[in-house]
Amino acid sequence: STSQPLNLSTSVFDISSPYISRLARIDGVARLTEKERLFKIAIEDNKSLGHSPGQFIMLSIPGYGEAPISISSTPSKKNTFEICVRAVGNLTNALHRLTKGDRLWMRGPYGKAFPIENLKGKDLLFVAGGIGLVPMRSLIKTILNERIAYGKIHLLYGVKAPDEILFKDELTEWGQHGISIQITIDKPHPEWKGNTGVVTTLLPPLKIDETRTVAIVIGPPIMYKYVIMSLGDKRIAGHNIYLSLERRMKCGLGKCGHCQINSVYVCQEGPVFRLSDIRYLREAI
C-alpha cells in the first residue's frame, strides 16, 4: 500500500503544544548599542505569538543551541514580535550575525506575566537596571496604550555608562506621555550631565504615595536586594512589589531543574513574582 502524506491538521502532532518549535524569520534588525540589537521576528505560520508582558520565548538556531529570551514588544494579533538581545554567548553572537530574511526556531511563550488588572488605578514605580528595561518595555508600552487607566508613573533607570542606554528615542516619547523618567549612570562620565550613582540613589528623594503605589523591578540579580531595601524605606508593602527574576532557564517547561529555587521553578511559576510570595525563599533574591 502507498503511504499517505502527513496531514498536520489531523496529525497526532499538536503544533500548538509548548514542546513544538515554530519556524520564524527575522523581519528587521536595529542596532541599539554596541552590544544590543532589536530584532523583529515574524512567525512563519502567520499566527500571533499570543504573549503577555513579562513572558519569554525559547529561541534556537540549529548548531548553536537554545536560550530563553524576553519578549520586548506589546501583545499583538499580528504574527510579529520583538526581542532585544545582548551578544554574550554562543547563540546570541550567532543571532547577531543574522540579517533580515534569515530563519530561526522558537517556542513559547512561557512563564507567568505581569498582572495588568492588578496595576490599573494604581501609581506605578518602575525600577530598571541595564537590560532589565527590555522585558519592562513590553509592560510600559502596554500601559501607555491605556494610559488613562493608571495614576502617576515613575521610571528609574540605571546603566553603567551613557552609551548603554537602551531605547533612547522611546524614553523621550514615554516622557511625553506622562511618565516621569530619571536615568542614572554608575560612575562619572565626561559626556554625562545627569545623575551619577547606582539606581537606588534615585529612590530617597522620590515623592510617592505608598498606599497606592505598585513597584515593578527588573535588573541584574545584585540589584534586587538593595532596591527592595529602598522600597521598604518608602513603606511599599511586599504584596505591591513585583520582580522579574533572572535565572538560568534551559527548557522553559519546568522539567530540567536549572531554574529551580527550593521548590519553585522560575520558568513556570515566574519569571514574574510578587515579593511577598518569595521573600522567604532562600537564594531567591
Q: Positions of the model-derived regions?
A:
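Local cysteine-cluster metal-coordination motifs and their immediate loop/turn environment
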Residues: I222, E246-P271
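Ferredoxin-reductase
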Residues: S3, N7, S11-D102, V159-A161
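Short microdomains enriched in Cys/His and/or Lys/Arg
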Residues: V127, F273-I285
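FNR/FR-type flavoprotein reductase catalytic core
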Residues: S1-L6, N90-K250
